[in-house]
Amino acid sequence: MASREGKRRNHNHDDEKLVPLAALISRETKAAKMEKPIVRFGQAAQSRKGEDYVLIKTDSLRVPSNSSTAFSVFAVFDGHNGKAAAVYTRENLLNHVISALPSGLSRDEWLHALPRALVSGFVKTDKEFQSRGETSGTTATFVIVDGWTVTVACVGDSRCILDTKGGSVSNLTVDHRLEDNTEERERVTASGGEVGRLSIVGGVEIGPLRCWPGGLCLSRSIGDMDVGEFIVPVPFVKQVKLSNLGGRLIIASDGIWDALSSEVAAKTCRGLSAELAARQVVKEALRRRGLKDDTTCIVVDIIPPENFQEPPPSPPKKHNNFFKSLLFRKKSNSSNKLSKKLSTVGIVEELFEEGSAMLAERLGSGDCSKESTTGGGIFTCAICQLDLAPSEGISVHAGSIFSTSLKPWQGPFLCTDCRDKKDAMEGKRPSGVKVI
């Protein structure tokens, strides 16, 4: 993930012929105005430790008092070593994300700025929770649905999957388990952590790979101040635009995913309403594995408007594998026209993906940072939103060997505390020295 140059997708697809041009033009005309989808959801859970929490909010507004700017938020927080981190994150993460977004943005600008705001919100939530001196931690899988656009941010192993019409299942998150994620193991060890299994009497090693000190089997989380700064809160973020055929999201804690694969979870609840689907996924996970952990599931259906008429199916193609490989199509330079064409033939358009743990990469250049232009040359910390005088701000690029910027005086800027937090996460100062 740290090696991935995941930015805004910008690729040319000039000669790829999916369907005849006349058919594309006809469908584009019929779908020229994509109405907002209907969003329905269901939730189910079985508790063993009482450390799983969810957030469901369907009435958030990009512009206060303007119902046409509504978006929905769905999140799962799987706590460990107590519930405090999960509860705190549920209560504060959304506000921290929203506070990192500049005001006065259009919808497209808001969606474009959202991935970076999610990074700031996750890191700020972690920093503030650690200042309380509590040692619990939590995963966080945070999903924002705005029209047909789905933006997902995650740390930990509470997976989110997308099931689209036709039975294609895709993961929208990355599991940050040391056992399964080679890149994260390498990042942790490079930052000064040790990765190994629990050793018992006689030197026998048991269980999954863990990070020491602390023994956490995850490489990213919120909280966990007792396990080293190389366990970072910087989320993997993915943003996609669904076709106007819609799709189903399944967001769940590892109590589900330890029992069911993504494909099985999707298949086991097809044809059911969102509410019944969530119950069925939990029921199937318990049937296969029993109640060994908190088991939580949210199902979100993004459904075409009632007056939507599905376009006729395309003629069968000989190269089915090629067509399937185009399910996730990258964004083109001719974005508006091609976007409408892609959506009419049922293709999910990938708008953004990034998984690097390096804040200099994730916070980017200062072009779209939340810098005040009203009075006194005041700047804002890109993470905690603290107002800074120009002499106080430290560029996120300053001293970073990972930065592509040759101008470390450019923004975005961090306050001293957040810069210390960044340095610790990147192994630039000893682990165990906590930022309070």
From Swiss-Prot:
Its cofactor is Mg(2+); Mn(2+). This is Probable protein phosphatase 2C 15. Residues 30-302 form the PPM-type phosphatase domain. Pfam families: PP2C. It comes from the Eukaryota. PANTHER family: PROTEIN PHOSPHATASE. GO terms for molecular function: metal ion binding; protein serine/threonine phosphatase activity.
